[in-house]
Amino acid sequence: MIVLDIPKMDYGQIEIYNDYFRNVDKKTIKYTPMECIEYKLSYCAIYNDRELPIMIGSSLDISKENPLNLKGYFIIDGICKSVNNIKIKEKIHFSKDRAYLSDDSIIQIKDMFNMTIKNNKNTLKWNLPLNWSDIIKYSDHKKELENHLKIIDSFNKKAEKPIKNEIDLISLCYMFECWLGLREEPRLYYRLVTPGELIHDIIKEKRSVIKCFRTNTWTVKNIRNVFCVSEDMKHYNKIGDLESIRRITIPSSRSNAPMKERRVEDNDKYKICPIQTSDGSLCGTITYLCKDAKITTKIDTIIVEKADNGLHTFFNNTYLGKVKVKTKESDIYCIDKICYIFGNIGRIIKGNYLCSYTGELLDYKNYNPPIRSMFVCNMIKQAITGDSVYSGDILHNTKSLINGDLGHKLEIAIMPWKKFNIEDAIVISNKVSKLFRSKRTIIHRENDVKILNVYVNINQNITKGDLLYRTYDPMQVKTINFVYAEHDGKVKEIIREEKYLKLILIKERDLEVGDKMSSMHGQKGIVSLIENNMPYYYKNGEKVEIDLIINPHAFPSRMTLGQIKEMGEKEEYVYIEDTKLENKIIVGKCLYLALRHQVDDKVQFRNGGNIDIVTKQPVSGRKRSGGLRFGQMERDILIGLGAWNTIKEIWSIDRSKIKIDSKTGRINWIRYDKEMEIGQYFKICLSYMRSLGRDILIKNDKYSIVEFDNSYLPKTDTMKFGDLDVLDLRIYKGIVMLPLCLRSTYLNKLYVDRKYSEAEKEVTKLLKSKNGAYHTLVEGHRVDRCIRSVIVPDPTLDIDTIKIPFGANIGCEYGLLNRQPSLNVDSIKLVKLKQGSNKTIAINPLLCQSFNADFDGDEMNIYGIRNKESIEEMKILAKVIENKTQDYILDKKDLTANKKGILEMIEKGSKGKMFNFEHMFKEIGKVTINKKEINIKGCYNNSINDEEWYEMCKVARENAASISINTPITGYLENICNEMYL
């Protein structure tokens, strides 16, 4: 058993918070942290007549109640929240394309003959100054720079006035050198703005900090509308909550950040963890402090001496003149003739560890590529652990292991399962399933609403979908709220008052097929089979049963030799049903984690059920057994295939009728002489359009859009109308008002406050935004007869047949199998449906290539179709085609991931390339970092040293970040771009 040792220390942010708020009156604190969580309150004091959130563990935290046993977080509206440390750039006077002058103007290069100057919010064209030759004096590449500036000057129609300030001339010189490639662009210098400083700045601006927490909209120094400052703590486990307090991010748009803001830098060694970061588009923009790294809590004092031969020196962006620096306490950066000294709070002080708390848990990281360590850092924070905080009755919706802390050491074998080599498909024993038994605690809390009914009792067993209780809130448009159970479970506790309710549900479960597991080496996979009769081997004459089987295909390309080292690198003869395998298999003990990604939380199916009374489409959400959305991209594929019968069947669920005057074409007018069947979505969009002054006429089977004549609408003196009829528009105090059923809570408030111009904007949003009626109801559709779950392999199935989750009888013999995002025509295939015995969707692995799917947690959808015409149509247009994959080239049941086996897999084209083999067993060799080649002499089998490992971290970060930076625009964004272009 591995025990997590999480210290309760801080890294300096608490001292900064205490310094800012040392004079706060502690008598203004009304509640304790536990009371705030129970009653959805905020743990605050009063400071300068404003609510000041109290940092848990600070000097203001007088209650000493610490629900998480951690320091540095806040409680807002009953939710534990962390505040990120924001990395802000220190000012340097030049970069590759701009220079900052002493008069606060900015020179920017767009191209060599197009330069601008920005001053006092005005941007004008800028030419070289009359004394441009003075710029060259400060260059080490005088000839090259002079030649270029001469060319630019020859195109100048008018020279700018001379620049006399020496620092300005130096800044321009260095800017031009960077632009021309004569000088390296200076690296980014930064400091961290911690929670205390952020909150102090907000209060200083006389703004509400609580509102910043609630809306997640902050101001960081001069940068407004920053949305990445505060986050709800996820409470997956203690190490995840700890790291959320030590998180660092950038204030700008993170998904669009350039590569230079994402890289692993030498200057960050022992300061910022090189492996723990988010993957995807945020890679490198979210990082974490190293294990014992701290930040400075006070502004430094420096000793300088005036000297004519000194450097132009700036201290915290204040110009000191030409000086010689006699202090070594601050960060000093000299760039030729300019010296920058940064001695402000928020600078990171090096520690003794290369990695964060999470990264330091990886004992064999030097035997693995850093990219695998990056993945496993994220998985550790998602692991189900045995911490008592997360199994109690404090936090909402938590999971915890009943036995163990961070996973369990299991007896592992690296081998195929009866000749089937299916990557990421894990086979476990029934014993392991029970060993990882976990407890889920679900807490329902209601405050300041009237509790009408509670329909359950203590110790009662609950089934998913059961009605738990009913509340009444007159402040909402939907005043009565029914709350249903999202999971099976047992009622542990009920506390009921007139306007307060706490209801606790407990569920214990074993691991089951479809749950996700991972080693500490990034070898993740889905439990695909729970086997009673597992293989075994003999150790000192005693029979040792295998707990978990991982496929050898997982090793050649991932190169995770650290897992083999952890297992002891031993090979033994393994027996399957008393038959001895011909070759020895790698076996040994290895730590495995059970992750939060469990099939219980993902499986969803529906044959019929509740329909939204307004949209007439199935309700949404797993807890209400809602329908799945057949989206815009899926619709476009059917249109591209010409599958009109299938489209008609899928879009036929919300049929409704409208009345039409054939003479005028008006819909639901005072006169009508015919009825027409149409989708309910049409009526909803029509109402929004009419509210915005537009109408649709249907005449002679053609439509036109005209201005809306609202003269025939009835007038009303109340806003409470239109509970069900979506076309029930009325005139209220001179404006066209939507019925209640189409109003959002915010729109209703705008109507009440008579803010009609803002109400018009809200109606436009309700119609046209990404979550608006047109996109959600017209471009896509929620459907009945649908299934969604995790996919697992079943090689015994026919290629065109799949097994659906147990109990998911959707009344269809055929269905459309789909994996989102649907990027091409192969993303939808017609398959036969067969009842399964698990909660997963089982498919033949030969289907994977078509959907670009694998078995590490991917989910797929099934949309059932019944009409004979649709089925016959899709048999022709979306027929399943067998694709041979790498998993089936080798047909050996005694393959393993030793040196011989890895080479065999590579040579036979099964998995990996020859360079993988060389990296593992010979030499990593040349790698490229920021367009520079370096040579790594070590290999993973012999463990690369810390210096080489850090260099490989740079490579891993650059490769991972480049994927998000260089990903082409697809789908919805592409449609927007095309529309803008046209």
UniProtKB/Swiss-Prot annotation:
InterPro entries: DNA-dir_RNA_pol_su2, DNA-dir_RNAP_su2_dom, DNA-dir_RNAP_su2_hyb_sf, RNA_pol_asu, RNA_pol_bsu_CS, RNA_pol_N, RNA_pol_Rpb2_3. Signal peptide: none annotated. Belongs to the RNA polymerase beta chain family. Its EC number is 2.7.7.6. The presence of the two linear plasmids, termed pGKL1 and pGKL2, in strains of Kluyveromyces lactis confers the killer phenotype to the host cell, by promoting the secretion of a toxin able to inhibit the growth of sensitive strains. Transmembrane segments: none annotated. This is Probable DNA-directed RNA polymerase. GO terms for molecular function: DNA binding; DNA-directed RNA polymerase activity; ribonucleoside binding. Disulfide bonds: none annotated. GO terms for biological process: DNA-templated transcription. It comes from the Eukaryota. Keywords: DNA-directed RNA polymerase, Nucleotidyltransferase, Plasmid, Transcription, Transferase. It catalyses: RNA(n) + a ribonucleoside 5'-triphosphate = RNA(n+1) + diphosphate. It is an enzyme of class 2 (transferase). One of its GO terms (cellular component) is mitochondrion.
